[in-house]
Amino acid sequence: MRVSSRKGESLAHLLKQEGIVNASVLNAVACTPRELFLPDALRHKAYQNTALPIGQGQTISQPYIVAKMTELLLASSNAPKAVLEIGTGSGYQTAILAQLFDKVFSVERIKSLQFQAKRRMNQLDLHNVSMKHGDGWQGWSSKGPFDAIIVTAAASQVPAKLVEQLNDGGRLIIPVGEQSQQLHCITRVGEGFNEQIIEAVRFVPLVAGDII
């Protein structure tokens, strides 16, 4: 069991005030050392509720949106166990998921970020995470279908490949849009889908095709 820090607990308390209610999510935030996922020059900002640059034109997401998206995944009626993450990035969201799901599968298009994230998972003794260097628009079909899918970059439209990889009752949480972005919650119901718009968000774009 992971141990919380005073700064982590303060951040979790702030997120609770911002509307995050799932106790498991708040505990995961409190127990995850966010400074581990940041460049040295930005570690003093680790417990601020803000997105920060991590290099390669990418960011570590605002803790509130990490918690909100995770909470939405866990609110699914099917008690999700296996989750696909599109956009490993720093690995911070990955580490939160690894404390709440039995299995985490994460796809990252930038090899150097994936390498660093994998090292951080080992540092934190989080061994239920599998990583792939690839195009997030394609998902990870050989490991699916998934109970939950979370996308940490904004797609111009919902990728069909990701929707296809959802289990019945599974949820896809994804930011959609270019200049104006909305967080979408899509639930698979048999062969159909229910879609709900949650709130306005701001993410880096989900790039298709190129992996580097």
Swiss-Prot record:
Top-level taxon of the source organism: Bacteria
Keywords tagged on the record: Cytoplasm, Methyltransferase, S-adenosyl-L-methionine, Transferase
Active-site residues per Swiss-Prot or TrEMBL entry: S61
Catalytic activity line of the entry: [protein]-L-isoaspartate + S-adenosyl-L-methionine = [protein]-L-isoaspartate alpha-methyl ester + S-adenosyl-L-homocysteine
Any GO CC annotation of this UniProt entry: cytoplasm
Gene Ontology MF: a single term: protein-L-isoaspartate (D-aspartate) O-methyltransferase activity
GO-annotated biological processes: methylation; protein modification process; protein repair
EC number: 2.1.1.77
Compartment(s) of residence: Cytoplasm
Enzyme kind, highest EC tier: transferase
Family membership: Belongs to the methyltransferase superfamily. L-isoaspartyl/D-aspartyl protein methyltransferase family.
Keyword Cytoplasm: yes
Role of this protein: Catalyzes the methyl esterification of L-isoaspartyl residues in peptides and proteins that result from spontaneous decomposition of normal L-aspartyl and L-asparaginyl residues. It plays a role in the repair and/or degradation of damaged proteins.
Protein's name in the database: Protein-L-isoaspartate O-methyltransferase
